[in-house]
Amino acid sequence: MRYIGKWMMLGALVSSSVFADVKVNIHRDVAPLVVNGEKVGFFISKKSVLDFDNGLNQLVVRVEKLIDNNQGEKEKFNSKPVIITFKASDRELDLFVDSVISRSKDAEEFELNPFFILKDKNGDPIQIMKQEILPNGGGITRDYETEVYRYNKKNNIIIASEKLSQSIAEQPIVEMEKGVEMVQYWYEKASNEDKKQFASLAFENRKSEIAKQNTKSQELDMLVYWFNQTSENGRKNIINWIMNN
């Protein structure tokens, strides 16, 4: 399985003759997490395109965007992940949300019933076999691949083809280090002040470890701890991720 999209535009363009049967254009506010049972790479772009074989396919997606909180500050909103099982052949589709999500109130309302629209270029909806919130498997961090496997087993869903072809740029799949994943986790829980302090510390110490900080913030302490447990390349990935969030 190969992922497609404008990952970081580091790969060479592939031949224009390499196309799949169904193309799905992902809206900039929608982030794919799992495609046909396999987790999407760490640096997938907001403006992604996925190519599928004809037939039954599956996506796990969520909304990822900056919104205004109740204090008038910008904060990152990651919605609950939704698993979409759909059937299509020889069509170009658009995946998006039919909701305006710009404030905390909008996000709260969307979370009550997160729903995504999948239409073709004529605006006609395509056959969605099933769409619902992906059940959480428990644990500190989400294991989306395992959750999808259990979901499909419970619902007797079999995806015949898990092959994706690349239509824009081909990139090596980036495996996320444990430290990078944990920094992501604690960063989402941190206050805006802690995020700013950690971002400054991470940038200053991108080639070394961050000295122990005397703070009363568990989130900041854990961010520093996991940053120090990560390789130099992983730290670069963390900094790049912070700059884009």
UniProtKB/Swiss-Prot annotation:
Residues 1-20 form the signal peptide. InterPro entries: UPF0319. Keywords: Signal. The keyword Signal applies. It comes from the Bacteria. The keyword Signal applies. Belongs to the UPF0319 family. PANTHER family: UPF0319 PROTEIN YCCT (PTHR38108:SF1). This is UPF0319 protein VV0984. It comes from Vibrio vulnificus (strain YJ016).
